[in-house]
Amino acid sequence: MNTSEQDRWSRVKGRLRSSVGEDIYTSWFARMDLEDVQDESVRLSVPTRFLKSWIQAHYAERVLSCWQAEMPEVHRIDLTVRSAVRPVAPPKEAPAPVETRRAPAPELRSTATAPVSANHDALGGSPLDPRLTFASFVIGRSNTLAHAAARQVAEGRRGDPVMFNPLYIHAGVGLGKTHLLQAVTWAGNSGNERKVLYLTAEKFMYGFVAALKTQTALAFKEALRGIDVLVIDDLQFLQGKSTQAEFCHTLNALIDAGRQVVIAADRPPSDLESLDDRVRSRLAGGLVVEMGSLGEELRHGILKSRVAAARAHHATFDVPEEVLHYLARTITHNGRDLEGAINRLLAHSKLNNQPVTLEMAEREVRDLVRPQEPKRIKIEDIQRVVARQYNVSRSDLLSSRRTANVVRPRQVAMYLAKTLTLRSLPEIGRRFGGRDHTTVLHAVRKIEALVSKDTALSEEVESLKRQLQE
């Protein structure tokens, strides 16, 4: 892809983001890539068939119109699924079939890329990447708690009391959620004691729908509920009322039986608006951990880890420290961009038989160096910071209390939610204890009027904004 095409693609993505909103863009379009541009057609790719089907069914016209705003001659968008080429271990010999009167559940066999225990082999699941283990996970300030909680789950034994259930990890794209979930699965399946199953939400949906079609839903449910540790990735993609109901039943059954559930998504439970309230409530009742953005020190550590991994197969490959610092300082979006940068330098160095230099790095990764995006502020962050500022609790802000020491902080928090987020008035009201949108509008207008004439309050509000934007 040349520079002009990359620039055009960036503008199209900006139009698409503005058109559908930040949340929808992150859920459905963040992993969409540009593959090719012809005279009247554009070829895009996504990592899964589910994403392809969903975008084609719900957003095809929107994507086309965004392209036509940049290239009026484009009349067709071709959406393809990227292939993830990984070596697959030879399949093990299948055990002898056992007679049963009940039809078998739809197969959920994992295409694992390294040897796993018999338990994992029998249970199956979504494909696992052998690189995504605890040994290769780089720990930093933004992921320490998530890593510790995941290790605690992975090191548990059958019959041990379950401390965090469910363990719910949320973060943006490329910040390490899937790495931790697969690390839990690899570690849990390293022995023969527990049954650990890793599934994407997409695989869960396909499995359940297939079970309904083949009239094996009961066997499907029993197979899932026999798991010791159920690991579900990308929960934001769970769609359909019947599928969500089954997921809720499975979640409740496993937790009530003392089995561990680990879940990852790109947002906290309260933001999964497509999910039933019962599911969100159960998810919020466990340990909810956010993995924050990667700081420069952590990015540097990830880069060094990726160089070391590459050197295991290419002994002469080396990246000077000044190049690592440059990459860590300028590639700030996510860990996948960092890994992509190392892969580019490796390819360029090996194919051209040249050492890696700072000049080469600046040239090869320039499209990964993105303008610093403004911090995405969440309503939960606003409530937390305001509660701390005014020495009240978050539950006070959400309560029906009308005392002066609670009403003013609540109004300030609602005002900040309206001015610093893209949430609608009804949504803000729901986040503040189920209040009506008119209550939010009154609070916003009240604070707007006060800050224009109350210097002290104006300074307080500006201080809160700075704290939230840091």
Curated annotation (Swiss-Prot):
Biological process, per Gene Ontology:
DNA replication; DNA replication initiation; regulation of DNA replication
Residue ranges of region Domain II? 73-126
Output the Gene Ontology terms for molecular function.
Answer: ATP binding; ATP hydrolysis activity; DNA replication origin binding; lipid binding
**Region feature Domain IV, binds dsDNA, mapped onto this chain:** 350-470
Which Gene3D superfamilies does the entry link to? 1.10.1750.10, 1.10.8.60, 3.30.300.180, P-loop containing nucleotide triphosphate hydrolases
Q: How does it assemble?
A: Oligomerizes as a right-handed, spiral filament on DNA at oriC.
The entry assigns this protein to a family as follows:
Belongs to the DnaA family.
Q: Where is the region Domain III, AAA+ region?
A: 127-349
> Keyword 4Fe-4S: yes or no?
no
Q: Name one GO cellular component term.
A: plasma membrane
Recorded hits in PROSITE patterns, A to Z, give: DNAA (PS01008)
Where is region (Disordered) located?
89-122
Gene name of the record: dnaA
Q: What is its main location?
A: cytoplasm
Check the record and name the InterPro entries matching this protein: AAA+_ATPase, Chromosome_initiator_DnaA, Chromosome_initiator_DnaA-like, Chromosome_initiator_DnaA_CS, DnaA_C, DnaA_dom, DnaA_N_dom, DnaA_N_sf
Residue ranges that the Swiss-Prot or TrEMBL entry lists as coiled coil: none
Which function does this protein serve?
Answer: Plays an essential role in the initiation and regulation of chromosomal replication. ATP-DnaA binds to the origin of replication (oriC) to initiate formation of the DNA replication initiation complex once per cell cycle. Binds the DnaA box (a 9 base pair repeat at the origin) and separates the double-stranded (ds)DNA. Forms a right-handed helical filament on oriC DNA; dsDNA binds to the exterior of the filament while single-stranded (ss)DNA is stabiized in the filament's interior.
UniProt keywords, alphabetically: ATP-binding, Cytoplasm, DNA replication, DNA-binding, Lipid-binding, Nucleotide-binding
Q: Where is this region: Domain I, interacts with DnaA modulators?
A: 1-73
Q: In which residues is ATP bound?
A: G174, G176, K177, T178
Protein name as it appears in the record: Chromosomal replication initiator protein DnaA
